[in-house]
Each structure stands twice: as structure tokens, then as C-alpha cells.
Amino acid sequence: MNVSAIVVEYNPMHNGHLYHIEKTKKLTNCDALVCIMSGNFVQRGFPSILDKWTKANMAISNGVDLVIELPTLYSLSSAEFFSFGAVSILDSLNIINSICFGSEIGNINVLQDIATTLLEEPLEYKILLKNYLDKGISFAKARNLALVELNRDNKIMSENISKILSLSNNILGIEYLKSLLLLNSSIKPFTITREGADYKDENLHEEYSSASSIRKYLKENKNINILKDFLPLEGFLEFKRLITKGYNFSMEDSMINYIRYKYISGYKNLHNLIDVSEGLDNRIYKSLEKSFTYDSLVGEIKSKRYAYSRIGRILCQYFIGFENYDLNSLLKSTPNYMRVLASNERGLKVLKEVKKHSSINIYTKLPKNTNTLLSLDIKATNAYSLLNNNIRFNEDYFRSPTIIKNTIY
């Protein structure tokens, strides 16, 4: 069985994601497509606009065969750990033949060369990197400059490397490739050129609009019909159904009062979070005292040193309660389970293959005794239930995966 995989967030699913699914199937000629997906919180540091079960059902309705949840610890981590968490789970299934991701460059060989250099860190690269860091240059910029200089004899590569490393999907793709190399994985990587608007673009465009623009529209408007051209048909119909039944679209603004209340109640242990460097915790506390919206809070905190997404992830982690866990130890280990959110009949065949070839724990219902990584997912869903009136406290214990039969794909 030829099984391919994609790593997604679907916040929310749009036409660009449908394009990714269709191109992956064509490029890999796979018999089945597995999707590992962020749950109720996403990597840019937001609550997901739709709960993870609704997102998973949409994915199955649009051509995915099996949806696995990416543990929240990884979905709220940097690109490096986000990618490693996803790839390590896929690799441990022992049945995934390929992975396909979108990138701005659309050239797997260039991304592979960069990933190899960053992982192996040849001596010349280490020296160049140290020289730039000693000048007080940020790590990301120092890394870019070191790579440019390392490739100075290759004029085309040297001139384009800074641009390549400035684009988010290229960066994520490089991290997927690094993870595959680190794990010595047999999974073959593919990339497709990303189509449509940049993820930061908040304006609706023909055919391929960004998830950001769709969220912005839903936040400000109630006429869902405008989005018909930007969403897969099944997704559009599901949105209409959700609006009819009064579904809560979870937005970052809905977290602000809970975060502020936690702070004024004396929970001042932000320093325990990995992304909180010295002094950042106090910067956040001061901003919490005078900011009353999510955007104003992040705007008050962010700087050249602290990116918007990093601040967003910290605030989500604090909202959930990550600061009470030993995150360093968790991130150094690899997940030993997969949580199934939805499947079709072809996906059930994939699960049978996993059971034959892998010792990984497969969870369709939660066990009574959960490990730390899984307990963080439960805490995340409980926190999310404060933002979404369709999700109950301890919803993880009530929900079983949706099995969708007779899908057209």
C-alpha cells in the first residue's frame, strides 16, 4: 500500500489546501493519504477557529483518508519542534512512503541542500555562524548570512538563499527535511509550489485566499455566502450549517480576559516556558496591565527580537497551563502514540497496516491513564472549551473518531 502524508493546520481549510491534497495524490500516486493536523491551537499562536473534530471531518470530506492529531505541545512550538513532532509520529507508523509539503520555491533539491547543511553544520559554517553571532546579530539573520557566504561560489544559490529563508513555507519545509534526516527516515519528501495569497494577507482574493483573510472576514461579517468561492464546497456547506446552529468561531480576542485574570490572580510563572527568554516575562506582565485586546497586547510585547507568532504561542501556552510542565524533557522525546480524529474506509485499512508494522499506541478513545503529552492535549481542549460553546469540558473523553463511509475520493 503506497501511503502519503501531509502536515496541516486547516485554520480553516480553503481552496489552497484542497489544491495541496489533489497535487499530493497526483505527485506521489498514493493509494491513501494520511493527514497529521494541529488540534484546537495552531502554530502561529491562535486558538483554531473550528474545533479539531470539525476540522478533521472537513478534511475527510475533501479527500484525506485518515486524520491524526498533532499533539498540542508541538502545534504550539517553533517550526523546528512543530516539524519534528509531526515527522517523528509519521516515521514511527512504519507505513508512510512519502510526505508532501507546500513551499514558495517548489524545489526539493535546494531545500534538501540547505537542510543538510543546517543539520550537519560543517566546520566552515560553524565558524561563519559564530563570527556573525559575536557581532550581536540575531540567530536567524546570522544563520542566513553564514549560509550565503558558505555558498558564495554558487552565485545563484548565494543570491537567493536569503529570500528562500525569509519565506515561511520554505522554512517549515527545511525543518521537515531536517527531521527526516535526523530520524534517518525512509519517507521520501516531495514539495509543491504554494499557490495563492501569503498567509499574512488579510484580503480575499480570487480562488486562493489565505486562511488569515477568511478568519478576518468571519470575524467581521455574517454573510457566509461571500466565502463560497474561497472554500471547498463541502467546507462551505459545513460553515453554513455551523452558522445556522449558532456555532462559536474561536478567535484570539476571546482569550484575553482569561489570560489577564490568570495574571492578576498571581500566576506569574511565565519564565518556565521555553520561548520565554530572560526579561520577556516581565515585558508580558507589564503589557497585561494595560492591554485590553489581544492585538494590542501582542503589539505591546512584540519587537524585532520577539516575533508576533512567538508571542502568540507563549500566550496560548500560558492560557492552557504549559508552564506547569517540564517542556524541555517532553520535546527531547518522541511521541509514542497516535490519536485518530477521523477516517474513511480507506483510512481504516491504513490503521490495519499500522497495527501490523508498528508498535505505536493507537488511540481512538482515551485511556484512563494518560501520559504527560496526552494530558496536555486534554488541558488544551478544556481551555478551548472556554472559547467555544460547542465544546464541553473533558470533551476528549466523550468523542470518538468520525468514520465517514462512501466518500467520493
From Swiss-Prot:
Q: Please state where this protein is localized.
A: Cytoplasm
Q: Which Pfam families match?
A: HIGH_NTase1
What top-tier enzyme class does this entry carry?
ligase
Which GO molecular function terms does the record list? ATP binding; ligase activity, forming carbon-nitrogen bonds; tRNA binding
Keywords, sorted A to Z: ATP-binding, Cytoplasm, Ligase, Nucleotide-binding, RNA-binding, tRNA processing, tRNA-binding
Give the GO terms filed under biological process for this record: tRNA modification
Positions binding ATP in this chain are: 7-20, 102, 169, 194
Q: Which domain of life is it from?
A: Bacteria
**Which reaction(s) does its UniProt entry say it catalyses?**
cytidine(34) in elongator tRNA(Met) + acetate + ATP = N(4)-acetylcytidine(34) in elongator tRNA(Met) + AMP + diphosphate
Q: Which InterPro entries match?
A: Rossmann-like_a/b/a_fold, tRNA(Met)_cyd_acetate_ligase
Q: Where are the transmembrane segments?
A: none
CC terms in the record's Gene Ontology section: cytoplasm
| EC number of the protein | 6.3.4.-
What is this protein's function per UniProt?
Catalyzes the formation of N(4)-acetylcytidine (ac(4)C) at the wobble position of elongator tRNA(Met), using acetate and ATP as substrates. First activates an acetate ion to form acetyladenylate (Ac-AMP) and then transfers the acetyl group to tRNA to form ac(4)C34.
Q: Family, per the entry?
A: Belongs to the TmcAL family.
Q: What is this protein called?
A: tRNA(Met) cytidine acetate ligase
